[in-house]
Every structure is written in C-alpha cells, then in structure tokens.
Amino acid sequence: MQKYNLPLWRVRALIAAGWEIDAHTITHPDLTAVDDAQLWREVHGSRVALRRMLHVPVEFFCYPSGRYNAHVIDAVRRAGYLGATTTNYGLARPARPYELSRIRINGSDGVVGFEHKLESVAP
C-alpha cells in the first residue's frame, strides 16, 4: 500500500461509523488509454479486492482523474457497479448513474464556502 492510504483498521472504523466504501481502480491509470485487459483488471479487480478485504458491498466507482468514455462506462457497468462519479461539478442526476457529478468540498472551504457551493447548484 502507498504511504497515503488508510490502514485497514481505519477503513473498517469508517465502515462501522456508516461510511460507504467504493472503488477507484488498483493503480490509478487513465482508463481511456489502457487496453481491455488492464481496464477490466482495474475496474473489476478493485471491486473484488475491496469486497474480499472489507466484506461489504462495493456498488459505486470513481473514475481516476475524472477520465472516462463510453467504453470505460461499459466496463464499469459490466463489472456490476450501480453507478460512477466523475469530477464534473454539479448535482448528481439519476438519469445518468454512470456519469454522476459532485460538489467537491475541501478542508479550506469552511462553513461559508460550503454554503456557497451548495447555493451555486441549488435548483
């Protein structure tokens, strides 16, 4: 494991506290630039590894660096994920479960910054 990864006991503590754990590949490649075999290892293999280690459902995927295309979406769908998040800013739309937008919150945002981000996407 890389030095910035959480120890397994901390991940289990997050799960016990109600956090959901989802997949993000094994080696963080640009999935639009890898061959089919590596694409499958990254997408399916990360799900299998997390389920094996943590004994929890792994139902969503996050595209590394936000890079994806129709071929990558197809692999994510075939691997059994219910949806995937992108780096696109905005509210998630249920009509596009494999292209879910999100609002990135940083530690430096503070309460006012958090409120501003929510207001910027409010319907």
Feature map (PLM): residue ranges:
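C-terminal active-site subregion of NodB/CE4 polysaccharide deacetylases
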Residues: 1, 11, 16, 20, ...
